[in-house]
Amino acid sequence: MGITIKKSTAEQVLRKAYEAAASDDVFLEDWIFLATSLREVDAPRTYTAALVTALLARACDDRVDPRSIKEKYDDRAFSLRTLCHGVVVPMSVELGFDLGATGREPINNQPFFRYDQYSEIVRVQTKARPYLDRVSSALARVDEEDYSTEESFRALVAVLAVCISVANKKQRVAVGSAIVEASLIAETQSFVVSGHDVPRKLQACVAAGLDMVYSEVVSRRINDPSRDFPGDVQVILDGDPLLTVEVRGKSVSWEGLEQFVSSATYAGFRRVALMVDAASHVSLMSADDLTSALERKYECIVKVNESVSSFLRDVFVWSPRDVHSILSAFPEAMYRRMIEIEVREPELDRWAEIFPET
């Protein structure tokens, strides 16, 4: 009825692997590559925890099937969830290595909670599939090549080396990130609303901000006759409309907002946003009941941002990227979006002077 990994044994092996990962400088490159790929933006956050747990189980007992998820699967299976929740997660907090997922039970999520073994997993998000296949293939190789506990231990050490590196990077960024983050927001706010091409820069800013959150963001030139959706910037998910944003550099009335919400929902959008930044604009935020009325009337979610800085703060809150990644990627994304929407050259140069690494 499966194999039970003793908690004390697992803790001892994991601690030893962590110490080796923290002190060694030569690791198995294929496992380093796999663990690094699981830190990409599209990679599900739970996969690193699953990989660490599977390798730990095999490093404790070489009879273990590393692709098992639930102990009931067969006589070589172990409980991925029990070992992860009982040993891996608490020790990641104690020792300070990053698992990607921050919850106490990362295995209690798709696709792991509903299957007994990796071979049974058939339903997984399209973007997640390549990462699941990589993990599954790597663990299958462990079994096919009959990894010993020592070989599994070395693979675990390599994966933990990446976990430690990520944790250290986050710690370094966290020390100064509040200042740097505030600086990026303030510099972008000042740049966008001053100089030439303010409407274009506003739209580029929204598109670049959404690039930090979503993978498919559509932004077209202002007054482009080929526009086939209401709004200036759209997010498309699996070919279907998800979110549309109206970007305005002048005052917007409640009537104007309702007209946009109406046309957006008619086009199939159920998430509708307005991003307006104009000195003449009279705030719409003082009457939340009116926003709620629009939501009830048109059966959608309505979001209003009334400054560039407000919008960018939301980006930092909701993006799946870490702060360091946004700080690195946003200036380049903003530059690219400005070129796309045909912002004039002097403004591009001004942006490049603010962020010279763009």
Swiss-Prot record:
What sort of enzyme, by top EC class, is this?
hydrolase
Q: What reactions does this protein catalyze? A: Endonucleolytic cleavage of DNA to give specific double-stranded fragments with terminal 5'-phosphates
Q: A Pfam family this protein belongs to?
A: RE_SacI
Q: GO MF annotations for this entry?
A: type II site-specific deoxyribonuclease activity
Q: Which GO terms describe its biological process?
A: DNA restriction-modification system
Q: Which keywords accompany this UniProt record?
A: Endonuclease, Hydrolase, Nuclease, Restriction system
Give the Enzyme Commission number: 3.1.21.4
UniProt protein name: Type II restriction enzyme SacI
This protein's species is: Streptomyces achromogenes
